Amino acid sequence: MKKLHREICGPVGLVPTMGYLHEGHLSLVRASKKQDINTVASIFVNPTQFGPHEDFKKYPRDEKRDMAMLENTGVDYVFVPSVEDMYPAGFDSWVEPGILQQCLEGAVRPGHFRGVCTVVAKLFTIIRPDRAYFGQKDYQQYLIIKRMASDLNLDVSVEMLPIIRENDGLALSSRNTYLSPAERQAALVLYRSLLTARSLFDEKEHRAEVIRKKMTDVIQHESMAEIDYVSLSHQDTLCESDEVSAKTIALVAARFGKTRLIDNMFLA
C-alpha cells in the first residue's frame, strides 16, 4: 500500500467488504466511481466481529468471483489482506465504540462493533481514503463508524447509500445464500413489517407502541420467523421514544432457520 500511495493522485474512495459481493456492494463501488478518481475495494472476512457461535467459518467466500465482479464494475484497486496482515502475532489494541453500540446489534452480538471499528480504523489507516462507502442495511454500523471517524479525527468522509432490494423487497445480503426456498419466502416478512410501519406513520399514527405492536404482529404471523428485535429509534441516536417522527428509523432483526437477517427503513 505504501507504493500505491506514491502512485495515486486525486481523491480515493474506499468500499470495505467481507466479500461474496452482490449488487448492494457494487452500488457502493459505482457511487465511488462517480465521486472519486480512485476507487479501492477491500475484501476481508474479519474474524473479530464474529461471536463464538456465529458463522465466521461458513461465511460465503469466492474471491475469484468477487474479483471478476469488481473488475467489471471498474474498481481501480482491490485490497485483500490476510488475517495475519490485519492481526499479527501479539496484536492487542482495539477501538471500543461508545453508547451507540449498546442497543440493537450491539446488545444481541456483544463485541461485534469492537471488531468492526478496529478493522475499519485499520483499513482507514492503511488505505487513507477521502471517502468510505457503507450501505444503509447495516445502519447502526454506519452510525458507529461515522462517530468513530469524527471522534478520532480520521480524515475521511463516511458516506451511506440506500438499501438495494430484490424485486420482491428482500434486502440484499451475502447471508441470503444460506436461506432455503421456504426460508427466503418467509424472510419477506421483514420488509412487510417495515412497510407496515411506514404506512401507519403516513396515516398519522405517531404512537411508537402501536406501530411496534403492528410490526411485531406482522413478523410473528410467519411461523418460521424468530424475532431478535423490533425497534423504532431516532435516526441520529438510536434512542427509542414514545412518539415517532420524521426522524425515526424502523429496524428489525429475525432468524429464519439458522440464518439471521436485519433490515430497516426510514419512516419519512
Swiss-Prot record:
The keyword Metal-binding does not apply. The lineage of its organism: Bacteria, Bacillati, Chloroflexota, Dehalococcoidia, Dehalococcoidales. GO terms for cellular component: cytosol. Keywords: ATP-binding, Cytoplasm, Ligase, Nucleotide-binding, Pantothenate biosynthesis. Belongs to the pantothenate synthetase family. The reaction proceeds by a bi uni uni bi ping pong mechanism. One of its GO terms (molecular function) is ATP binding. Homodimer. The active site is at H25 (proton donor). InterPro entries: Pantoate_ligase (IPR003721), Pantoate_ligase_C (IPR042176), Rossmann-like_a/b/a_fold (IPR014729). It is an enzyme of class 6 (ligase). GO terms for biological process: pantothenate biosynthetic process. It comes from Dehalococcoides mccartyi (strain CBDB1). Its EC number is 6.3.2.1. It is found in: Cytoplasm. This is Pantothenate synthetase. ATP binds at residues 18-25, 135-138, 164, 172-175. The gene is panC. Pathway: Cofactor biosynthesis; (R)-pantothenate biosynthesis; (R)-pantothenate from (R)-pantoate and beta-alanine: step 1/1. Its main location: cytoplasm.
